Curated annotation (Swiss-Prot):
GO cellular component: cytoplasm
Keyword Thylakoid found: no
Protein name: Peptide chain release factor 1
Locations listed in the record: Cytoplasm
Family listed: Belongs to the prokaryotic/mitochondrial release factor family.
Function (record text): Peptide chain release factor 1 directs the termination of translation in response to the peptide chain termination codons UAG and UAA.
One Pfam short name: RF-1
PTM field: Methylated by PrmC. Methylation increases the termination efficiency of RF1.
Residues carrying N5-methylglutamine: 237
Superkingdom: Bacteria
Species of origin: Pseudomonas fluorescens (strain SBW25)
Keywords annotated in UniProt: Cytoplasm, Methylation, Protein biosynthesis
SUPFAM superfamilies: Release factor (SSF75620)
Length: 360
């Protein structure tokens, strides 16, 4: 393991001991803000320190086993050979774990998100598939205890959505959904197809982290056009509806956002402004992210909206993620909310890219 990583681990171990003492201090315990902050840091540092302690113990075991390789007793030497092999395997595993634990954290991972799903090529079938994708993410959210609120929707003529925008709130939402942005393709026989021919349609998904108030982009009110309108429609589980809605146009960029979630215009405006800030921030950061991804020849993590990332083939019950050459024959389970089957391999690939960058 690199000396720089070992130095960082030593610093974290000292900090862990300091945090342990602080959390037992009466003055800290009486200050709830400090206590929460230190408790959060303790929870982040503790597993790293525990793994580091395990690594140092295995290193000591390895040194002891290597010393026994010189023993005069052939049985002891034979046993030592096996112990050395096991210790080296364990060391490699623990070093890999620690490297992953020390990877830079995405500051947006813990944020809520704005989820945008739009029908692309394929007409009515694309709109129906947009509805399928929204249900998939809603069911995934239910499994994780997240809350989904529709902000804006434009229903398709034969079901689904031409466009649906939702806010997803919960723990580590962006960290889980950030690689869902891109073009999702479906191959199936539409219900309206009398000849039984397979059609190909597509939808685009965008996942934008919700900025907090301190980090929200400052927007000049003179750059905005605000329209109000009345909205109605059928709601579903975890979805709030309203009679009043707001549409905000950011004139310099042409970005339009609308919200019909809350019953008060004031709340709708606040939510729409937060969404607008997220879109403007995404506009600024996506170009830089694409440049980095292109330079390092990455697909996972580029966030390119035009990139075809996944195909859902109903005839074969197959889901293929093209970025990591992942093919799963569990379409029904994934559409029922089992999206982790695709998300976890993507996160693993992203971490591998980060580790490779550290080694460059």
């Amino acid at each position: 393991m690199k000396a720089s990583l070992l130095n960082k681990l030593d610093v974290l171990q000292d900090r862990f001991e300091e945090l342990t003492a602080l959390l037992g201090d009466g003055e800290v315990i009486s200050d709830q803000a400090k206590f929460r902050a230190y408790s959060k840091e303790y929870a982040e540092v503790e597993p790293i320190v525990a793994t580091y302690k395990h690594l140092t113990k295995v290193q000591a075991d390895l040194e002891g086993a290597q010393a026994l390789l010189k023993d005069s007793d052939p049985d002891m030497r034979e046993m030592a050979v096996e112990e050395v092999r096991e210790a080296k395997e364990k060391l490699a595993e623990l070093e890999g774990d620690l490297q992953r634990m020390l990877l830079p954290k995405d500051p947006n991972d813990g944020r809520n998100v704005f989820l945008e799903i739009r029908a692309g090529t394929g007409g009515d079938e694309a709109a129906i598939f947009s509805g399928d994708l929204f249900r998939m993410y809603s069911r995934y959210a239910e499994r994780r205890g997240w809350r989904v609120e529709i902000l804006s929707e434009n229903e398709g003529e034969h079901g689904g959505y031409k466009e649906v925008i939702a806010r997803v709130e919960g723990d580590n939402v962006y960290g889980k959904l950030k690689f869902e942005s891109g073009a999702h393709r479906v191959q199936r026989v539409p219900a309206t197809e009398s000849q039984g021919r397979i059609h190909t349609s597509a939808c685009t998904v965008a996942v934008l982290p919700e900025p907090d108030e301190q980090e929200a982009i400052e927007i000049n009110p003179a750059d905005l056009r605000v329209d109000t309108y009345r909205s109605s429609g059928a709601g579903g589980q975890h979805v709030n509806k309203t009679d009043s809605a707001i549409r905000i146009t950011h004139l310099p960029s042409g970005i339009v956002v609308e919200c019909q979630e809350e019953r008060s215009q004031h709340k709708n405006r606040a939510r729409a402004m937060s969404w607008l800030s997220a879109k403007l921030n995404d506009q600024q950061t996506s170009a830089a992210a694409n440049a980095i991804a292109s330079e390092r020849k990455l697909l996972v993590g580029s966030g390119d909206r035009s990139e075809r990332i996944r195909t859902y083939n109903f005839a074969q019950g197959r889901v293929t993620d093209h970025r990591v050459n992942l093919t799963l024959y569990s379409l029904d389970e994934i559409l029922a909310g089992g999206v982790d089957a695709v998300i976890e391999p993507l996160l693993a690939e992203y971490q591998a890219d980060q580790l490779a960058a550290i080694g460059e």
